[in-house]
Amino acid sequence: VLDTKDLQVFKVTVNGQDAKFVFGEKHRFKGTPLEITLPFELRRGQEAIVEIAFESSPKSSALQWLTPEQTSGKKHPFLFSQCQATHCRAIFPCQDTPAVKLTYYAEISVPKELVALMSANRDGEMPDPEDSCRKIYHFSQNVPIPCYLIALVVGALESRKIGPRTLVWAEKELVDKSAYEFAEAEAMLKTAEDLAGPYVWGRYDLLVLPPSFPYGGMENPCLTFVTPTLLAGDRSLSNVIAHEISHSWTGNLVTNKTWEHFWLNEGHTVYLERRIGGRLFGEQFRHFQALGGWRELQNTINTLGDKNPVTNLIPSLNEVDPDATYSSVPYEKGFALLFYLEQLLGGPDVFIGFLKAYIQQFAYKSIVTEDWKQFLYSYFKDKVDVLDKVDWNSWFHAPGMPPVKPTYDMTLANACVALSQRWIKAQECDLDSFSSADLKDMSSHQLIEFLALLLLEAPLPVSHVKRMQQVYDFNAINNSEIRFRWLRLCIKSKWEEAIPLALKMATDQGRMKFTRPLFRDLYSFDKSRDLAVKTFLEHRASMHPVTSMLVGKDLKQDQ
């Protein structure tokens, strides 16, 4: 039995013999099982080669087909895939579960002016013998991976070398900017190897996608996919690269066996990402990023509700589409647990020893939380009394914020807290006391935190946000993380002049982290609700299928 979704199957053979096949019942989001009957009895140890002739649908939930107008170059179409969590089945029949790992090789035929890339080693190219206008690219991935990590992109791509094992790929218009933005990749890789062990994947290339890519990054092996919203111009959003690099160990080598245990992938990856940041930019910076993550978690839980079972670290996903529950919870609640354990068990040096041993123990396997916990107990066997004091049940199975808040170094956060408090406490008559000098010693990271703190409070009076624009000119800032929080702040304060800017950001790019909250806020504001729905319906056809589905739910257009 194989998973499929919106696929047509024409013929199946097993070891060259025709095999009978039938489709089972179609499921709401899981697709349709393909049941193949072997034409002969299999003996133990006998190999069977199953060949399937099939075709995917133009509406495949794993693929976005962009018209030339939707690309930077405006000349050629573009295709990219996004298989996580359960969309690989919408490209080809497979065992679409992270419990199963496989190696793969592929040949991709494309028009010769375009380039094909996959989450694999590039094994060269040749003219297509069947069509002189096309060429064939060869790929092989020799490390076993879950099929959610199979990825394909086709477009007018160019590359720049930014390290001994790293090319950055993008359309011509963005490739030099991307090469500058991600120049720290090799330093991050070296730091990650030092923390987590050898990098087993060979190459580490980066691909910058068109703006509709729905995530910040996707850790496809050998070829990380990233959103162009990371191109801030000052490398300030490079923590996403550290995050995707970290997945080369946590997620891609040690993998969650089911999506309920997604925190094993993401919590450990955020932990490693921040350890890399700590090595490169100092321990205070790591604590500052960790505190920002705690705010992000507070924000998510405010949105979802603190009794909502999807805020459990290990949610129940029976008959639940993993895409529909995607949030910062597995990332930030998972990280908070690891950061708390680090502080409980003897500090960063002690805890990284555990993480390295954990990766060695479970590399190339898929595991559940109980495997992780048993290994934690065996590694820290002399500290079992400390571990027994942890409220495991609340951490794993209770909704809302974690039962314990870790300790954070506040050095870099204090300026953000002080400035946000000044704005919160300010009366109309105090607004003249603010000036552009307030921000002169603050980094982009601190501006993000300042705005995040304001977003956790009751909305500011509209006079305050108008004054903020006057003195800080946030509208002129293109850093996507700053702009996103600033526009949310404006809409929450019901500043009508911000409506077109928020709609523009929600539709100019399709990273769900930005697009969904902006649309939700615009929908909550009576003055922009109808326009938000109208704008969504106008742009829907050009949106990524997953983004379109989830924004449709947010705006009550789909059930």
Predicted segments — roles?
Residues 1-206, 216, 303, 326-329:
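Acidic/His-enriched low-complexity segments
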Residues 4, 44, 84, 98-100, ...:
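Generic detector of ordered secondary-structure context
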Residues 9, 14-17, 30-34, 139, ...:
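Hydrophobic alpha-helical and helix-loop surface patches within well-folded domains
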Residues 142, 209, 521:
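Short, loop-centered acidic/histidine patches that primarily coordinate divalent metals
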Residues 155, 282, 304, 457-458, ...:
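Short loop/turn hinge sites at secondary-structure boundaries
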Residues 327-334, 343, 351, 359-370, ...:
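Long, ordered, helix-rich scaffold segments
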